[in-house]
From Swiss-Prot:
Name of this chain's protein: Sugar fermentation stimulation protein homolog
Gene3D superfamilies: 2.40.50.580, 3.40.1350.60
Organism taxonomic ancestry: Bacteria, Pseudomonadati, Pseudomonadota, Gammaproteobacteria, Enterobacterales
Domain of life from the UniProt record: Bacteria
UniProt family annotation: Belongs to the SfsA family.
InterPro entries: SfsA, SfsA_C, SfsA_N
GO MF assignments: DNA binding
Any matching Pfam family: SfsA_N
Length: 245
């Protein structure tokens, strides 16, 4: 488990703005402006009135020492809005041998430069007796009609990552797109064709070329975050739609 130390503190969300900032009010009535480590649309994750949980940094150089970590929605779901946690969570689960699909490697390297488009891979797994495994981690928090979608906004960077992963397979390596589902209401995952059609098309192409797509849910609470169960990826309906066109 990734434990929050010191413990997170609750507050009520007033407004998220300028992408990286949010105004909150603590239970004691103190108004704070905190940092939001999420560049996405955060649809359904930032409703005014939601309870949010924040961490506090001891770095004296930070202008906004508090960071928004979790949202507890008014419908009872928990969401990790700090996208920087996704890589940390997947790396921790791999090191603890909790993900069977990614077990058996001796070394884990982070943020390694690679590819034809000047990219950095989130995690690179290596072992003497197997192919290098390139892992791109994506945080999934968009819940619509009982399904989790990625991305929540058009992502040219995400499109590039899919091309790079496909090229890794062509070059004889193993490539994995890992969807870290950080919303407790999400029970299945699909590409957000209605938001970023090109990303969805590239995802289908990448999987057909041999890129593995793995989706896992996580248990979330103010105490910490822990790997839960594997979740299904829905591509059949999209493939049917593509073929019809």
């Amino acid at each position: 488990m990734l434990q929050f130390t010191p413990p997170l503190q609750p507050a009520t969300l007033i407004l998220r703005y300028k992408r990286f900032l949010a105004d909150i009010v603590t239970p004691a009535g103190e108004a704070l402006t905190i940092h939001c480590a999420n560049t996405g649309a955060m649809t359904g994750c930032a409703t005014p009135g939601d309870t949010i949980w924040y961490s506090t940094s001891d770095n004296p150089k930070r202008k906004y020492p508090q960071s928004w970590e979790l949202t507890q929605t008014q419908t009872g779901d928990w969401i990790c809005v700090n996208t920087m946690r996704a890589n940390e969570l997947v790396n921790l689960a791999i090191e603890k041998n909790q993900i069977a699909e990614l077990s058996g490697y001796n070394f884990v390297r982070k943020e390694v430069k690679y590819g034809e488009e000047n990219s950095r891979i989130d995690l690179l797994l290596q072992a003497e007796d197997r192919r290098d495994c390139y892992i791109e981690v994506k945080s999934v928090t968009l819940l619509q009609q009982q399904c989790g979608y990625f991305p929540d906004a058009v992502t040219l960077r995400g499109q590039k990552h899919l091309r790079e992963l496909q090229n890794r397979v062509v070059n004889g390596h193993r490539a994995v797109l890992f969807f870290a589902v950080l919303h407790t209401g999400i029970k299945q995952v699909a590409p957000a064709r209605h938001i970023d059609r090109r990303y969805a098309e590239l995802l289908v192409q990448a999987q057909q070329a041999g890129v593995e797509v793995i989706c896992y849910g996580f248990q979330l609470s103010p105490d910490g975050i822990e790997l839960n169960t594997r979740l299904p990826l829905l591509l059949d309906e999209m493939l049917s739609s593509e073929n019809a066109e």
